[in-house]
Amino acid sequence: MKIPEGPCRVCHSVKGTRRHFGITACMSCSSFFRRSLNCKFYCPANNSCTILDDQKQFCRSCRYNKCVQSGMRRDCVRKQSYRRQAGRKEAKSPAVSCSNKLSESYEELLNFYVKEANESIARKRQSPLKNAHQVKTSKELLEISKSEDKTSLDAVLHCYGTYILDDEDITTLIRYFKFMNTWIDSAFVYSKSTSNEELLDGNDICKFAYQIDTSIGLSLKNLNLNIFEYAALRAICIWNLKFYETSPKMKSLALEHYKGITGALRQYYENYMSDMDIAVRIGEITMQITTISDLFHDLITLHQKYQIPF
């Protein structure tokens, strides 16, 4: 039996706590700490604010100080570097900040998702067991879903802006990341090969794999996306699946990510495409949201049928 981790040492929440950066903490506080390392905050109340999970708003300065005082270690935060693709031309536009919620430039935001996509795709190619299209039984469905739990959690904790979200929103975002990591990334890799019609004769799990292959898999094959375009598609879908009800803060952050990602795509394209061609290409990418949203709904239905948590 798993031993409960106890309440968050920062805000005292008991929801979804685990070890983060050296202490027991909730996902919301750990994400806030990760994104606040290089930020400077000001407290109008002389750093005397109370930090409790039932508060609607936190003083960022006091929350960060509480993280440090509670034992969160800066040296435990994973260092990430975001490099430009070798040989890529400089964008004509200067670096632009995404919004007042996201201090990162368009390019930094897209590079985060490129790194996540590359790592997920590499896992699929290194191990056939990571390819969701090979799943045929309820046991395999459970195993492949659980295999992406940690990577999806890590992605959310390192994702820009998520420190403002409540635990419920973070849990929702983890599910969206896991769906993309497990099924859509498999479709991206699998779409390079021929369709496996034998899946049609199998159970509902096999039929779902075939459904993905012949819908979004076929679209990805026809679009012939490079890694920058595919990473942008992943990011746009993650923030726009809208299956679960989310807070106004998450809706607002989703809009900022959408603006940032589409802005990054425009900068990426502007060296070799006209404004009209850019609009058409971005439209082709964003049109996939509906298909992927429908597939997520069908996956949740599949998990419910086999009584497998997702």
Curated annotation (Swiss-Prot):
Family note: Belongs to the nuclear hormone receptor family.
Keyword terms, alphabetized: DNA-binding, Metal-binding, Nucleus, Receptor, Transcription, Transcription regulation, Zinc, Zinc-finger
Classification via Pfam families: zf-C4
Native source species: Caenorhabditis elegans
Domain NR LBD, first and last residues per copy: 101-310
Protein name, entry field: Nuclear hormone receptor family member nhr-89
Subcellular location: Nucleus
Gene Ontology CC entries for this record: nucleus
Ranges annotated as NR C4-type zinc finger: 8-29, 43-67
Function noted in UniProt: Orphan nuclear receptor.
Broad class of the protein's primary localization: nucleus
Residue ranges the UniProt entry marks as DNA-binding: 5-79
Molecular function as annotated in GO: DNA-binding transcription factor activity; sequence-specific DNA binding; zinc ion binding
Leader peptide range in chain numbering: none
